């Protein structure tokens, strides 16, 4: 028994306490995790997709949104049934066997490597708005490697409440910026004939180009894998899960289709070609906002995006 005046030692954490601490992520945190990759895909894929899909770019992104909905529902169901880390590899093991699980794991790993490489190089293209040499040569490589190193370090440190809050704030700011670009772009440039006029199905674009463009739009869906890998650390009831699925899907449709419409109207397809596919390939969103007017607005948004 403790002597009078002495503080009692803190009680050892019970299994229930540990469980509460561990299962601490809610729907806002998961939305932030999912949206970081989805939002980044607009910044690097818009130019490639527009260069291949041309006037069908909005429809390609709409199809990507439908595919995201189906994929997201699959992940939500799988994560609810099997609350283990590793996402699709766990689902594949339960549904099929260890071999299929192994193949799925390596495919996801390769997808992550591709996404990291593309995102880090694209980031340098946007940073070049502040300092042009960052967009090419050795400076670009050095900055890209530094970004990869920072991401690796952040993932080694793991999640914390502060990091989750910071990520959520960044996601909200990014959503606001993208909605602002969409709103201004639609007011300044929207014209349905500008989108449909250059479309000649089978030739401009070709069906193979449309399929390739659609494949590019799905690269960032690995964010679902990231969120699914945290399924054992979340506190989501049916209502919270429904809110997460609805908000993520609504955001994808609005941002993807909205940005695609603004892209092909602000930088229209001419003679089966768009500047988004070459001149603005590395930083397509900057290519869009520099077309805005007045010039002061374009200059401001150039640095904001």
Name the predicted role of every residue range.
Residues 2-13, 43-46, 72-79, 154, ...:
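Juxtamembrane interface elements at the cytosolic ends of transmembrane helices
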Residues 139-190, 204-205, 245-249, 253:
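Membrane-interface loop-to-helix entry segments
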Residues 25-42, 147-150, 184-187, 200-254, ...:
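Hydrophobic, membrane-embedded alpha-helices of multi-pass small-molecule transporters
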Residues 125-133, 191-202:
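Membrane-interface helix termini and inter-helical loops of multi-pass transporters
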Residues 91, 97, 129, 133, ...:
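TM-loop-TM module centered on a large, flexible mid-protein loop between adjacent transmembrane helices
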Residues 78-80, 103, 125-134, 147-173, ...:
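Membrane-water interface regions at transmembrane-helix termini and the short interhelical loops
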Residues 21-22, 44-147, 248-258, 301-302:
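Extracellular loop-to-transmembrane helix junctions
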Residues 1-56, 69-75, 84-85, 195-204, ...:
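Membrane-interface "cap" regions at the ends of multi-pass membrane proteins
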């Amino acid at each position: 028994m403790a002597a009078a005046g002495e503080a009692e030692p803190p009680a050892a954490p019970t299994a229930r306490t540990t469980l509460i601490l561990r299962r601490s992520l809610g729907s806002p945190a998961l939305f932030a995790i999912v949206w970081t990759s989805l939002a980044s895909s607009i910044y690097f894929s818009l130019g490639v997709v527009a260069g291949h899909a041309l006037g069908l770019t909005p429809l390609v992104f709409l199809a990507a949104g439908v595919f995201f909905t189906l994929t997201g529902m699959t992940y939500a169901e799988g994560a609810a049934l099997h609350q283990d880390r590793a996402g699709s590899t766990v689902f594949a093991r339960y549904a099929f066997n260890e071999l299929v699980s192994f193949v799925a794991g390596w495919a996801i790993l390769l997808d992550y490597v591709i996404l990291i490489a593309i995102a880090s190089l694209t980031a340098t293209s946007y940073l070049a708005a502040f300092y042009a040499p960052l967009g090419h040569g050795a400076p670009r490589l050095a900055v890209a490697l530094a970004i990869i190193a920072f991401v690796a370090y952040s993932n080694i440190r793991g999640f914390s409440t502060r990091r989750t809050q910071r990520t959520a704030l960044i996601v909200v700011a990014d959503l606001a910026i993208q909605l602002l670009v969409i709103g201004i772009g639609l007011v300044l440039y929207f014209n349905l004939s500008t989108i449909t006029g250059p479309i000649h199905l089978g030739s401009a674009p070709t069906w193979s180009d449309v399929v390739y463009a659609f494949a590019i739009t799905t690269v960032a869906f690995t964010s679902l894998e990231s969120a699914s890998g945290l399924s054992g650390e979340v506190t989501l009831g049916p209502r919270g899960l429904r809110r997460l699925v609805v908000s993520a899907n609504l955001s994808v449709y609005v941002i993807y289709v909205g940005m695609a419409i603004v892209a092909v109207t602000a930088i229209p397809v001419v003679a089966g070609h768009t500047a988004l596919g070459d001149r603005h390939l590395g930083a397509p969103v900057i290519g869009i906002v520099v077309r805005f007017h007045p010039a002061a607005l374009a200059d401001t948004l150039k640095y904001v995006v």
